[in-house]
């Protein structure tokens, strides 16, 4: 799916200014560049573009409130100076799996004064001698590099993931509310169907009763006819002896 189309779907009838988290993982970028993102996403705090084929972030829009940026598994090899200009409040940056080969490539990150965590897993720069020591010297504002601090203490999960989980919880609550509303609509429709079926059964019952009544009426008529026939025959038998007596006279 193209990145522009993915952004449209992620909006879910919201305006860009309402969005705080945007996940575009595995979508397709146009010619290796970001597309569909504009300055209108002024409240955006978390952006994830994992494995979208990026080679450049030059057209990244102004995102003053962006705190966490996921760029892993792309083909970015430089141009990181744009981050300090467009995302001055960035605290977490993941460049794992990109084509970062030397320290000079990440030097522009010095201008990100609030940068607290940087990930460079599976980048060639990690193979350099004294890699960790040199990165911490180059970027003194960093607290965590590849998930560990200067003393090789692992970053707490709450620091790395807590912010995103908080956003996920909010979205889950919204989804649950939407689900509950949809479920209620379905229940109401089922109740209506049951009522209609009940009415149909009542009508069918009345029709059957009418038919039975009609049939009973036919039987009664037949019985009346039989009784009437017997009376006529009886009267005829009475008349016959009388007729015979008259003949004798």
Curated annotation (Swiss-Prot):
Result when mutating residue 158 to A: Complete loss of phosphorylation
Pfam families assigned: LRR_9
Physiological role: Multifunctional protein that is involved in the regulation of many processes including tumor suppression, apoptosis, cell cycle progression or transcription. Promotes apoptosis by favouring the activation of caspase-9/CASP9 and allowing apoptosome formation. In addition, plays a role in the modulation of histone acetylation and transcription as part of the INHAT (inhibitor of histone acetyltransferases) complex. Inhibits the histone-acetyltranferase activity of EP300/CREBBP (CREB-binding protein) and EP300/CREBBP-associated factor by histone masking. (Microbial infection) Plays an essential role in influenza A, B and C viral genome replication. Mechanistically, mediates the assembly of the viral replicase asymmetric dimers composed of PB1, PB2 and PA via its N-terminal region. Also plays an essential role in foamy virus mRNA export from the nucleus.
LRR repeat positions: 18-38, 43-64, 65-87, 89-110
GO aspect biological process, one term: intracellular signal transduction
Effect in UniProt of substituting residue 196 to A: Loss of interaction with influenza virus A PB2
Biased composition (Acidic residues): 157-230
Natural source organism: Homo sapiens
PTM comment: Phosphorylated on serine residues, at least in part by casein kinase 2/CK2.
Molecular function as annotated in GO: histone binding; RNA binding
Effect of residue 204 to A: No loss of phosphorylation
Gene: ANP32A
Assigned keywords, A-Z: Cytoplasm, Endoplasmic reticulum, Host-virus interaction, Leucine-rich repeat, Nucleus, Phosphoprotein, Repeat, Repressor, Transcription, Transcription regulation
Region feature Necessary for tumor-suppressive function, mapped onto this chain: 150-174
Protein name: Acidic leucine-rich nuclear phosphoprotein 32 family member A
Phosphothreonine PTM positions: 15
Interaction with E4F1 as annotated region, ranges: 165-249
Family: Belongs to the ANP32 family.
SMART domains linked: LRRcap
Effect annotated for changing residue 189 to A: Loss of interaction with influenza virus A PB2
Residues where Phosphoserine is found: 17, 158, 204
Feature: compositional bias, Basic and acidic residues: 147-156
An example Gene Ontology CC term for this record: nucleoplasm
Top-level taxonomic group: Eukaryota
Residues covered by region (Disordered): 147-249
Compartments where found: Nucleus; Cytoplasm; Endoplasmic reticulum
């Amino acid at each position: 799916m193209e990145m522009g189309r993915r952004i449209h779907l992620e909006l879910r009838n919201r305006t860009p200014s309402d969005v705080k988290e945007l996940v575009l993982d595995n979508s397709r970028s146009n010619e290796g560049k970001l597309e569909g993102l504009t300055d209108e996403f002024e409240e955006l705090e978390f952006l994830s573009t994992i494995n979208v084929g990026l080679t450049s972030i030059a057209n990244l829009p102004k995102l003053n409130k962006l705190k966490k940026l996921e760029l892993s598994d792309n083909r970015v090899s430089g141009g990181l100076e744009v981050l300090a200009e467009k995302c001055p409040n960035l605290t977490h940056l993941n460049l794992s799996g990109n084509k970062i080969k030397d320290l000079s490539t990440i030097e522009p990150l010095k201008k990100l004064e609030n940068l607290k965590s940087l990930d460079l897993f599976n980048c060639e720069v990690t193979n350099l001698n004294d890699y960790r020591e040199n990165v911490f010297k180059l970027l003194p504002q960093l607290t965590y590099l590849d998930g560990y601090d200067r003393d090789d203490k692992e970053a707490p999960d709450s620091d790395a993931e807590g912010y995103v989980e908080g956003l996920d919880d909010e979205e889950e609550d919204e989804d649950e509310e939407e689900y509950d509303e949809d479920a209620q609509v379905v229940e109401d429709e089922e109740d209506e169907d049951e009522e209609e079926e009940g009415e149909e059964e009542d009508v069918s019952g009345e029709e059957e009763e009418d038919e039975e009544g009609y049939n009973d009426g036919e039987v009664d008529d037949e019985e009346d006819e039989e009784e009437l026939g017997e009376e006529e025959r009886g009267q005829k038998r009475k008349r016959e002896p009388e007729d015979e007596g008259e003949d004798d006279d």
